Amino acid sequence: MPLPGGLWWLLCCRRGFTLLHRDYGDGELSGDGDEDEDDETFELRTPSPAGGGRGSLDVTLTQPTRNGPISDRLQGWEETWSLIPDKGLPEEDPDIIVKGWLYREPRGGGARPWLLPRRAWFVLTRDSLDQFSSSGKGARRLGSLVLTSLCSVTGPERRPKETGLWSVTVSGRKHSIRLCSPRQAEAERWGVALREVIASKAPLETPTQLLLRDIQESCGDPEAVALIYRRNPILRHTSSALYAPLLPLPYEVSAPGPGYAPLREEAVRLFLALQALEGARRPGPLMQGVLQTCRDLPALQDELFLQLAKQTSGPAGPPGLPATQDPATLRYWQLLTCMSCTFRPGGAVRGHLLGHLERTEQALPDSELAEYARFIRKALGRTRGRELVPSLAEISALSRRQELLCTVHCPGAGACPVSIDSHTTAGEVARELVGRLGLARSRNAFALYEQRGAQERALAGGTLVADVLTRFENLTSEEAGLEDSPDCGWRLCLRLHGPLHPEGLSPEGHELPFLFEQAHALLLRGRPPPPEDTLRALAALRLQSLHRDFSPRGPLPLLDRLLPPPIPPREQPPCPTRRPPPSAALLAGALWSPGLAKRRAERARRGGTGRSTGSTAQVGGGGASTTAAVLGGWKRLRGMGQAEAMAAYLALAAQCPGFGAARYDVLELSTEPGGGAPQKLCLGLGAKAMSLSRPGETEPIHSVSYGHVAACQLIGPHTLALRVGDSQLLLQSPQVEEIMELVNAYLANPSPERPCRSGSSSGPPSQDLPDTSPPSQHQVLEEPQGQSGCLKQLQD
């Protein structure tokens, strides 16, 4: 029976469809022996086994060009067959590692589901992956894939919507092969074997790496270096495209990250972005995008360093004499400056880059290019890892080789401008401001904080301020479209870090007003909420320090600037009894404060008296009785000087329970096997004790003085270990470094009220407990045992 005409036409034109797909399709096929691949001039070479030196290159390595039609390109199977002798299936070859029947999925099988996987006999040796028509003697070889150190293997993974088989993808220089098997164990066996063969291969080198080695060996002979540049255009500036990366990058089919192409394709795109810099009206965002790509794909950092060294060498070789003042020429140097302040180049690339900069300085000592070269050399010596790429303001400053100006807000001193560079740390800025304000001999410790409204977080001493400014810029751009964005954005501020020492403050220095303003800011945010009489006394002292003696002719003060905002009363339903966290059994006993149970029993006996008092204290923000009480206390302070009022304010505020306590959201990890899931808790660090409480609760569940803390150390990226006696508490938080620094600061600062670390004593008194609950949920804490003379004077 004759076949239908349409089927005859399909069979006869199958070869024609393949050629059309090769010429006008995606450029790469993965059929049985019909793979079409791009021709590349850059051959990869294996280093000589003897190692060491090589003779000078006699051949000229040029940038690959595409002059002929696409149909004239070499086919992948022709290239691989030229490397392997044409022979049949080997018999008992000792180099065979794995062999067996597998399915090979045609390229584009997901897009063309009618192309079914083809079954073939695969043999893996130490040099290649071969495909045969059968497993018998004399079987015809259908194709080969040469395995090098740059090949990559992905999988196994199952594709239920396509083939339903387990697949392993092997990516080579020209094409990739997807091996399929119905059994997962077999796919895993092939994947492991392929990875072991690739890992055993010697690393390959590109011609660019060989030329870099020649330049390094001839660095003492300028004429030899110039000759290498003249004979090899790949090292010089070019206006044409780059079709292959300068460094050996792994062959991959899958993208290394969301929004990115494979590494080799991204390297070519980077070079196109560099060339786009020459005509860009706003080069800053384009530079930032290039830096972000290198930040997301670290394998491209050395590649970009080499591309910039190539483009800054000039068409005739280094140092690039033509049009040194041309902005298009300088933009390569500006991007290289940003790169040197963000990333650290590898060994060979770093040596070549330093040599390139040195040759530029020697050839053009008084030019602007030499200034850029000197700036970059200094930056390479100081650069370490960056968390974020430079901000647009930093890129603009680096393009002019200038420092960046940042503003730090200091209580009592206003905004202080500080000049920083890409390597300045938060500790260096804090030390500079401490010295500028005359606080170097103070007993109090200070640190740099990032602040936004009531949110604040201490910066570790080694944090780069440039990264913090970049984060502020990103947050500002994200919140630009929000309608309910806050009035004040993120800012840097200098504040007290650790325990407060109000005694012995000089009335003439900056420390007294500094601490005075910071204490007032903490009280306005409800940290901590003092009793009603203490609040009124503090308000009167602040009025005396700001306006001196009371005058009936003056305007009435605004109490909302003197007292914390009122808390709306609400009924709290009785909460059920919760299961205690692991720390209840772990840190129970004499180490934890026994005063907690006594205070709970006392408050239960009084039956909510403290809560009503707290409402009175907080609601008194604008009442007539509160205003009269504050004004009455202000009148009784007549004759008190400004410095004396500030000192009395600090002394009274320091007696408030939990004054200056820092709070952190943590996860408590169980130290017992099978102890359960981590529990969310709130860690409070006060001047004399630390406490743990549940989120939203005002009463701490545990408290321990610093004298009982034996050690505080990091045991993981976000895990902190606190050793209390013979027990250990594990806490997890993204701010573990800040917590550890603050705890160690308290541990290194003994005081007469705090028990010694080596001694044993009872828990801290009530005012030593840190405050760990949100400001809107505070109850009034008990009045401190001792009151200053100023408070007694106000109550008389």
Swiss-Prot record:
It holds the Pfam family RA_2. Residues 757-766 have a biased composition (Low complexity). Residues 598-608 have a biased composition (Basic residues). It comes from the Eukaryota. Residues 1-18 form the signal peptide. Keywords: Glycoprotein, Methylation, Phosphoprotein, Signal. GO terms for cellular component: cytoskeleton. Residues 563-583 have a biased composition (Pro residues). Residues 28-71, 557-584, 598-625, 750-796 are annotated as: Disordered. PROSITE patterns: FERM_3 (PS50057), MYTH4 (PS51016), PH_DOMAIN (PS50003). Glycans are attached at N474. Residues 29-41 have a biased composition (Acidic residues). Residues 237-399 form the MyTH4 domain. Residues 404-757 form the FERM domain. Residues 59-68, 774-796 have a biased composition (Polar residues). Disulfide bonds: none annotated. The modification Phosphoserine is found at S30. The modification Omega-N-methylarginine is found at R638. PANTHER family: AGAP003327-PA, PLECKSTRIN HOMOLOGY DOMAIN-CONTAINING FAMILY H MEMBER 3. This is Pleckstrin homology domain-containing family H member 3. It comes from Mus musculus.
